[in-house]
Amino acid sequence: MDFNRSFTSNLGSAGSAKSQQSMFKALRRLHGQNLESRGLHDMTEAFQSFVTRARFFSIGKLRRTWSHSAAEFMKYRRLLPMLLADGDAFDGGETDDFDASIAFQHTSRDDRKIVVSNISAKVTQSQLQSFFSQYGKITSCILPREEKKTSVFGTLPKHSRNCGTATITFKKSEHADRAKNANPEELKFYDQVMVVSAYVSKKRGGKGLVLSDDVGSREDTPLSRASSTQSLASGSEQSFNLGNVPDKILRRVISFLPIHETIRLERVNKKFMEESIKSWELVNKIALARETVFNKQRPMRTSHLKAILTRAGAHLRSLDVSGIVHLLDDRRALKVIATCCPNLVDLDISGTHAQAEALEELGESLSHLEQLSYRGMETTGDKAFYFLLKNCGHSLKFVDLRNSKRLHGRSFKLFGSQLESLYLDGSSKVDEMAFEDLCTSCGGLKELRINECYKITDENLSMIARRMEDLSILTLCGDGFKSLTSAGLIHISHMRNITELALDYNALVNDELLISISAGLPLLSSLSLANAGNDSSITAEGVSAIKNLKELTQLDASSLAAVNSKVLEQLGSLKKLEIIQLRNCTYLGDDGVRAKLRMPNIRHVDLSGSILVSNDSIQQFIKAFPSGPKLPPITLVVGGTAADASKLSVRGSRVVVDFSDYSTIVTMQTSQCSSSKFAIGGSASDAEGSDDEFEALTAQRSFYIDAVCGEEESPITDDGKLAEWAEKEARSLGLIKD
C-alpha cells in the first residue's frame, strides 16, 4: 500500500513538522495492529500468503518476490525505525480517510480478461473468438480441450471435446465490461447460454479457481448440459463442505482410493495431508498389479516403490509386486521392502531378479513371514533360493516356486515343520534328494503340487506316503516321469487323508491304480484323470471302480476311451457329484447322459467333443431339472456334439445350455505335453510327432463332420449295434490302433 499517496491530504494541509509527527504516530498505530493480526492488516488471502512466506524466509530474500504486496512491504520496512520512535498522543481523526482497498485494485491486464463457461462441446476456439469479437477486439482466446484418447480400432472421434470453459483477453477493459454486462440471450450459442464472469488471477485469488464478483446474480440462470468450473465449485461448496467431514470418515474414504491418488491428497491442505498419512494404518494389503497408473509408458521405478512403502510399509501384512511393469533396481527395491515392511506375513516378489546377497538381506529382515511366492524365475539359480530361505524358511507355511527351471532343491532342508503348502509345478530339475529333504523336514505338509517334476522316483513317493500323514492335496500331472513306474504310483492309495488328486496326462495311470485309489482313499472329493494312461491301460473296469468314492464331488475323465454309456450308468450312484467333465469321450452316447439324471447335486456337465450325444438325451436332461425358487442353475456344455440348437427348448428349466466347444483346450494341452516330451529326449522326431498330431486331429474332425453333416441312414436303435458301428468307424479312421 502506498502510504505517501494515502496521506497526501494530511501532509498538504498541515505544517511539515506536525504532519510528519502525525504520520509517524499513524504508522506506529498501524504497526501495532499489524503485529496483533500477524500480517499487513490481514485483509486478503494474497496478503496472508505473502506474510506466511515472509515469516519463514529471511527478509533479505523478499526482493525476489515481485508481487504488488511485496513492493509495499519493502516500503513499510524502511519506515520501521521511525515507527518505533515515541510520540505524542495520537489523534484518531487524522487517519479517518485511510482506504485499505487501494492495495487490491485490479491490474489492467486482469480487467481485460473474462472467463466464459457453459460452452457447447461443438464450439471451436476460432468460433468462440469470432462470437465475442462483437464486443471488441480480442488479443487471445484460450479454449482447453480434453486429453485426446487413442485406440487401435479407430473408433474414437478425430477431435477431442473442449472443456467447457475458456479465457478471453480483450484489447481494452471497456470491451471486457461489455461482454460481462451482455444479456443472456446475446450469449446463446449452439442452443446453450454461455456464462461470462470476471477473471481473477491465481495470485490475487489465492487459489487456482475461477472466481466471480456476481455469483448471486447468476444463481437462477438456466444452464445446459455443460457446467463451468465456477458453477461446480460454488455449487459443491454450498451443498457439501469436505471440511465438515469427520476425520475418521475422511480417513476411511481415503483408504479406498488408488495409491497414487492417496499420495496426491497430501498436497490439498494440512487436514488432508494428516488424514492421508493416517489412512495408511487401515491398509494392510497392497497388490501393485491393480494400480493402473503403472504401464509400459510409465513403468514403476524404485523411487515409486519407496514412496509407497515409506508410508504404508509399517502397517502392511501382505505385499504383492508381481505382474507389474517395472524398471526396478532389484537390489535397492528389495532393500526398501526389507527396511520399510518389517511386519510382512505374505510376500510375492515374482518377476524381481536379484543377487543372492540382496535376497539374504530380505530374508533376514522378515522374521514374521509365513507366505512366500517367487515363481516364474527361470534363470534364477539354486544359490539364490538358498539365501532367500536361509533365515525365513523355518517359519513359512506357504511357498510358491512354480516354473523355477534351475531349482534343484538344496534349500528344501531349510523348511520347517510349519510348512503346509508347496507349489513346484514346472520345476523339472528338482531331484530325488530334494524330495528326501522335504519328507524329513516337512512332515506336516498338507498340499503338494509337483506337476512336471520329472525326477521324482518310486522311493520318493513311498516316503511321501509314509512321512506326510496329513497330506490332503496331491497333483502329479505330466507325461515325462522317467524315474517313476506304475507300481510306484500305487503308493498314492496309502495316503488315506487325500481329498484332491490330479493325474492329468500321466501315462503311468492304469486300472490297478484306479481300483487301489477307489478302495484306499475314502475321503477323496476331487479326481482329475484327463488324458491319463492310454486306451489299453485304462478300461471300463478301472473307471467303473470310481463309483466306490462316495464323497466325490468333482470328476474329470476327459479323453478317456473307456468312458461309455455303461460306465456312466454305474457312476450314477455318486449322489454328491457336482461337477463332471467328459470332453472328447467319443464312445459316450445318449444313455450315458441319461444316467446323470440320477445325480441330484449336479451343477456343471461338460460334454464338449462327445460326438455321439444327440438332442434326445440333452432335451431329457433339460426337462429333468425344472426351475424353481432358490434352485441353483445347472450348466450343460454341448459344443462339438451332434446337438442342434434350433431344436432344443429350455423353457421352464434351470439348465443353461452352453454351445461352446472346449475340447480344443484338451488338444492344445496334449500337443504342449508332447512337445515337452520330445524336448526331454523322446525317440520320435519333432516332425514325425507333428504329423501324427495333425493326422489324428484331421481324422477326429472328419469323423465329427460326417456324423453331423453326412447323409442320414436308417437309424440304429440297438445299443450293441451302435457300439459296434462306432468302433468300426473309429478303427477305419485310425482313432483306435490294434
From Swiss-Prot:
<dbReference type="InterPro" id="IPR001810">
    <property type="entry name" value="F-box_dom"/>
</dbReference>
<feature type="domain" description="F-box">
    <location>
        <begin position="239"/>
        <end position="297"/>
    </location>
</feature>
<protein>
    <recommendedName>
        <fullName>Putative RNA-binding protein EEED8.10</fullName>
    </recommendedName>
</protein>
<dbReference type="GO" id="GO:0019005">
    <property type="term" value="C:SCF ubiquitin ligase complex"/>
</dbReference>
<feature type="compositionally biased region" description="Polar residues">
    <location>
        <begin position="224"/>
        <end position="237"/>
    </location>
</feature>
<dbReference type="GO" id="GO:0031146">
    <property type="term" value="P:SCF-dependent proteasomal ubiquitin-dependent protein catabolic process"/>
</dbReference>
<feature type="region of interest" description="Disordered">
    <location>
        <begin position="211"/>
        <end position="237"/>
    </location>
</feature>
<dbReference type="GO" id="GO:0003723">
    <property type="term" value="F:RNA binding"/>
</dbReference>
<feature type="domain" description="RRM">
    <location>
        <begin position="112"/>
        <end position="201"/>
    </location>
</feature>
<dbReference type="InterPro" id="IPR012677">
    <property type="entry name" value="Nucleotide-bd_a/b_plait_sf"/>
</dbReference>
<dbReference type="InterPro" id="IPR006553">
    <property type="entry name" value="Leu-rich_rpt_Cys-con_subtyp"/>
</dbReference>
<keyword id="KW-0694">RNA-binding</keyword>
<dbReference type="InterPro" id="IPR032675">
    <property type="entry name" value="LRR_dom_sf"/>
</dbReference>
<dbReference type="Pfam" id="PF00076">
    <property type="entry name" value="RRM_1"/>
</dbReference>
<dbReference type="InterPro" id="IPR035979">
    <property type="entry name" value="RBD_domain_sf"/>
</dbReference>
<dbReference type="InterPro" id="IPR000504">
    <property type="entry name" value="RRM_dom"/>
</dbReference>
